[in-house]
Every structure is written in structure tokens, then in C-alpha cells.
Swiss-Prot record:
Ca(2+) 1 binds at D91, D93, N95, E102. This is Calcium-binding protein 8. Keywords: Calcium, Cell membrane, Cytoplasm, Golgi apparatus, Membrane, Metal-binding, Repeat, Transmembrane, Transmembrane helix. Residues 1-234 are cytoplasmic. Residues 1-41 are annotated as: Disordered. The gene is Caln1. The chain crosses the membrane at residues 235-255. It comes from Rattus norvegicus (Rat).
Length: 261
């Protein structure tokens, strides 16, 4: 995921050495190769039905009266539902709130090694009522305007990803070709390494939960179709979550830079 580039070659001069150190001015959150976390630290595999993703079949889908509804007026039902599903993925314990610990685990699963300072800044940005956790209205109020103003907003709609997987299914492209198709569609927000990490993580999650993904296919080719459907559903959530994290990282980086000036 790309953060705003600094003057010069765009590379940070120093890396964050520990969780308690404050990043230098203009420094990006520390990246690492795909980490080998224990199973319990991997992103949970959520089985999402197409109805939930594309038809808006959520209870209490409307934003609360306290949210800035005027800024979010241009958010489509599909975008709102995908943001809500990404929120559910981040909310590991399902209590309706995102904690700093849950946010940290989500970022680490995508290869980011945020310091405690960076996590605190992101949480402060999201936690509008100061209760130490983030509910969906707070999450949406911060993310919504960013999504509306994003040039790549259409790329994160589920039907775009479905179109990509239609090419994968019908043209029988290789996994390497699929990576390049995904990179071309999402390169404004994701690097090739991001895409590879997401695919690896989701494939591992699928293997660990094989047999639990409920799909509608039956017959001779059902196993292959079920597997592709489960991977696609999981990737939709993963890409939406990756976009959300990239937005939060940009906001955190801007706050860090402004605080140093």
C-alpha cells in the first residue's frame, strides 16, 4: 500500500526500531516480508454471501444521526455494505467494536509492523467519542469521505473483483497472471507484494477452514467451483480491508508529519 511520498527519492531515511519509538518525520510504517504468525493471529476467514455483499441485506444499515450524513450521501449501497463487511473482518471478537489490539493484528497480517505510537495515532483518528474503541459509525464517518474522493473507488466494488475472477475462470489464466490482473486493477492502492500477501493469507485460511464455506454448487465440478467462490468472497473482504488500512495509514502519516512541523 502506498503512502504519500516525501521530497527526494521517497524512501524513509530511518526505520522504526521498536514498538515504543516515535517514527521520524515523513517515515512510513515499517514493512516486513509476509510474517509467519501462529494460526490464531491470522486474519479470520469470513464466509460472506453474495446477498450480503451486493444486495445490502444488513440489519440497521443506516448511519446514526450523529454521523455526517451529508458527506456520505454519495456512498452507494454496495460500497456501504463492503465497508461494513470489512468492519466485521476487523472486529475479530464480533462485539461491534474495533480495539487497538484488533487493528494491530489486522495490519500485521498484511505485512505491516506498526509501532504502538502509530497504532495510537490511528485509533485516536478513528475513535471520535474517546471511549478507546471504534464503532461502525466512527469507522464510516472517517472512511466514507476518503472513499468518495478516491479515484480508485470503483476498483473496490465487488462486481469489479467478480469480473476479474470471471476472466480467471473462463480464460483459465494462471495464478501469476491473476496477480498481474489484480495489480493492474488495484495498483493505485496496493503493491504487488500486498496482493501476494493477501492471496497467500486467504489461501491458508481457506485450507484451514475447508468444508466450512457454504456455496450453492453441486455436481462433478462442484469442488473446484466452491473453492473459487470461497477464495473470491474472502478476497473481496481482504481487498476492502486493505484499502481501509491504507487510508488509515495515510491519515496517520499526515498527522505524524504535521506534528513534527
Amino acid at each position: 500500500m502506498r503512502l504519500p511520498e516525501q521530497p527526494g527519492d521517497g524512501k524513509p531515511e530511518n526505520e522504526t526500531k521498536g514498538d515504543q519509538e516515535t517514527p521520524e518525520r515523513g517515515e512510513e510504517p515499517r514493512r516486513s516480508p509476509a510474517p509467519d504468525f501462529p494460526t490464531w493471529e491470522k486474519m479470520p476467514f469470513h464466509h460472506v454471501t453474495a446477498g450480503l455483499l451486493y444486495k445490502g441485506n444488513y440489519l440497521n444499515r443506516s448511519l446514526s444521526a450523529g454521523s455526517d450524513s451529508e458527506q456520505l450521501a454519495n456512498i452507494s449501497v454496495e460500497e456501504l455494505d463492503e465497508i461494513r463487511e470489512a468492519f466485521r473482518v476487523l472486529d475479530r471478537d464480533g462485539n461491534g467494536f474495533i480495539s487497538k489490539q484488533e487493528l494491530g493484528m489486522a495490519m500485521r497480517s498484511l505485512g505491516y509492523m506498526p509501532s504502538e505510537v502509530e497504532l495510537a495515532i490511528i485509533m485516536q483518528r478513528l475513535d471520535m467519542d474517546g471511549d478507546g474503541q471504534v464503532d461502525f459509525d466512527e469507522f464510516m464517518t472517517i472512511l466514507g469521505p476518503k472513499l468518495v474522493s478516491s479515484e480508485g473507488r470503483d476498483g473496490f466494488l465487488g462486481n469489479t473483483i467478480d469480473s476479474i475472477f470471471w476472466q480467471f475462470d473462463m480464460q483459465r489464466v494462471t495464478l501469476e497472471e491473476l496477480k498481474h490482473i489484480l495489480y493492474h486493477a488495484f495498483r493505485d492502492h496496493l503493491t504487488m507484494k500486498d496482493i501476494e500477501n493477501i492471496i497467500i493469507n486467504e489461501e491458508e485460511s481457506l485450507n484451514e477452514t475447508s468444508g466450512n464455506c457454504q456455496t450453492e454448487f453441486e455436481g462433478v465440478h462442484s469442488q473446484k467451483q466452491n473453492r473459487q467462490t470461497c477464495v473470491r468472497k474472502s478476497l473481496i473482504c481482504a481487498f476492502a480491508m486493505a484499502f481501509i488500512i491504507s487510508v488509515m495509514l495515510i491519515a496517520a502519516n499526515q498527522i505524524l508529519r504535521s506534528g513534527m512541523e
